[in-house]
């Protein structure tokens, strides 16, 4: 069998989804109620990084980019993550705040997609979270000029040790280039895998002060 033949075998990789369906009658009026339930179940199932989510942005040319970050807070105002403000994603958000989030809970045969606008968090919110992080993580935030090219990992490690020595006394200050974003909740889609590829998809879409719920074809 040639290498090409082996690669083509991926076309046959599939399985049935058997974890159960999602029915309209079981949906709460508020999407965050269902999100909280699903997130809790993802945590109870001991999934690796259940709060990991894909953040999709686009640059000024319309080129999409994706990366995984961790959800750090959520409420009716939106979903929060933190990042280096000099990063590619931060620059792209400043240029175009419309983003999409995706929670890929494969083991539970579920995914949740969020569409909304990202806005910068206040310095007070950022500082409160920053000082709740492990000390080494705080120092790590100072080390990297995110998305810039570097010649070797050793540069980062040396910088970390240098800053660890510098900040050994007292609190680690909040870097001016480190912050967070809150993504508003305009649309939230819940996907549950189904047998015979008849998946269940429900879209919550905000209309004024209420949520409209539609079932989508798989």
UniProtKB/Swiss-Prot annotation:
Report the Gene3D superfamilies cross-referenced here: Electron Transport, Fmn-binding Protein, Chain A (2.30.110.10)
Q: Which cysteines are joined by disulfide bonds?
A: none
EC nos: 1.4.3.5
Q: Name one GO biological process term.
A: pyridoxine biosynthetic process
* Binding residues annotated for FMN, in chain numbering: 67-72, 82-83, 88-89, 111, 146-147, 191, 201
The keyword Lipoprotein is annotated on this UniProt entry: no
- This protein's source sits in the domain of life called Bacteria
Among Pfam families, the record links this protein to: PNP_phzG_C (PF10590), PNPOx_N (PF01243)
Which residues are listed for substrate binding in this entry? 14-17, 72, 129, 133, 137, 197-199
List GO molecular-function terms, semicolon-separated: FMN binding; pyridoxamine phosphate oxidase activity
How are cofactors bound according to the entry's free-text note? Binds 1 FMN per subunit.
Q: What class of enzyme is it?
A: oxidoreductase
Identify the cofactor(s). FMN
Q: In which pathway does it act?
A: Cofactor metabolism; pyridoxal 5'-phosphate salvage; pyridoxal 5'-phosphate from pyridoxamine 5'-phosphate: step 1/1; Cofactor metabolism; pyridoxal 5'-phosphate salvage; pyridoxal 5'-phosphate from pyridoxine 5'-phosphate: step 1/1
Q: Which reaction does it catalyse?
A: pyridoxamine 5'-phosphate + O2 + H2O = pyridoxal 5'-phosphate + H2O2 + NH4(+); pyridoxine 5'-phosphate + O2 = pyridoxal 5'-phosphate + H2O2
Keyword annotations: Flavoprotein, FMN, Oxidoreductase, Pyridoxine biosynthesis
What the entry lists under InterPro entries is as follows: Pyridox_Oxase, Pyridox_Oxase_CS, Pyridox_Oxase_N, Pyridoxamine_oxidase_dimer_C, Split_barrel_FMN-bd
The entry's function note states: Catalyzes the oxidation of either pyridoxine 5'-phosphate (PNP) or pyridoxamine 5'-phosphate (PMP) into pyridoxal 5'-phosphate (PLP).
Assembly description: Homodimer.
Q: Which HAMAP family match?
A: PdxH
Please give the PANTHER family that the UniProt record associates with this protein.
PYRIDOXINE-5'-PHOSPHATE OXIDASE (PTHR10851:SF0), PYRIDOXINE-5-PHOSPHATE OXIDASE (PTHR10851)
Q: Which family does it belong to?
A: Belongs to the pyridoxamine 5'-phosphate oxidase family.
The protein depicted here goes by the name Pyridoxine/pyridoxamine 5'-phosphate oxidase
